[in-house]
Design a protein with these regions (language model features):
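Functional beta-strand-loop-alpha-helix junction segments that form "active/interaction loops"
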Residues: 1-33, 153, 157, 164
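Second-shell loop/turn segments in exported
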Residues: 4-13, 24-26, 50-57, 112-117, ...
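A mature extracytoplasmic/lumenal domain signature
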Residues: 9, 41-43, 53-55, 84-86, ...
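Extracellular/periplasmic catalytic domains that process cell-envelope and extracellular macromolecules
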Residues: 28-32, 72-74, 93-97
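A short, glycine/acidic-enriched catalytic loop
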Residues: 32, 40-74
Length: 194
């Protein structure tokens, strides 16, 4: 089963409702699961994600508050992908042995492609639309995406964003195990359907 954490913020993440949502996800998931969180937004020099919405005044989400929000999931394997300027600054507060973190840029660099007209940022397209369609190895997919982002930025004459990766071996191994299980289940289902 898949469970989703939806957080609608009007206050800081220590708000009881938001922590309750993270706790609920922790309770519904087990050690066999992997929580995959994709965040895309504008990022700031102060390592905060903009979550502002039209007609709503929402506080930005600082890196340390995202880490606090994920604390109820500290015993779960997690992949956190952040596509935003300065997103490399999210790695230090998020990194641990059960959390893989991919970011679209170094802590001191902007990333590109964030606009209403685009389906993806440069990094999002390179990772999700391209690299993960070529390999299900997360570390390899990141390297492919990083190379493609660099090529596109060079072609556009932009300063390199230099995507970052924190990839603990236990998370990579758990991901591979889950992907093998999914492949086996798909093969079994296809065989039964014939």
């Amino acid at each position: 089963d898949r469970f989703y954490l939806e957080v609608q913020r009007t206050n800081r993440v220590n708000d009881e409702e938001h922590l309750h949502a993270a706790v609920a996800l922790a309770e519904r998931s087990g050690p066999e699961d992997l929580v995959f969180l994709y965040l895309t937004s504008h990022g700031s020099h102060d390592h905060e994600l903009s979550i502002d919405q039209p007609r709503l005044q929402l506080a930005d989400l600082p890196a340390d508050e995202l880490a606090a929000l994920l604390q109820p999931l500290r015993d779960r394997y997690k992949v956190v992908v952040i596509s935003a300027c300065y997103s490399g600054g999210f790695i230090p507060p998020l990194k641990d042995d059960k959390t893989l973190v991919m970011t679209a840029a170094r802590a001191d660099r902007v990333s590109f492609g964030c606009s209403e007209e685009n389906d993806f940022t440069y990094f999002g397209r390179a990772l999700f639309a391209e690299a993960l369609n070529e390999t299900d190895d997360l570390a390899r997919a990141f390297e492919l995406a990083k190379t493609r982002v660099a090529e596109r930025e060079q072609a556009d004459d932009f300063e390199p964003s230099e995507p970052q990766l924190w990839a603990p071996k236990p998370v990579l191994e758990h991901w591979k195990k889950l992907r093998r299980q999914q492949a086996e289940e798909a093969l079994s289902a296809a065989t039964k359907a014939q």
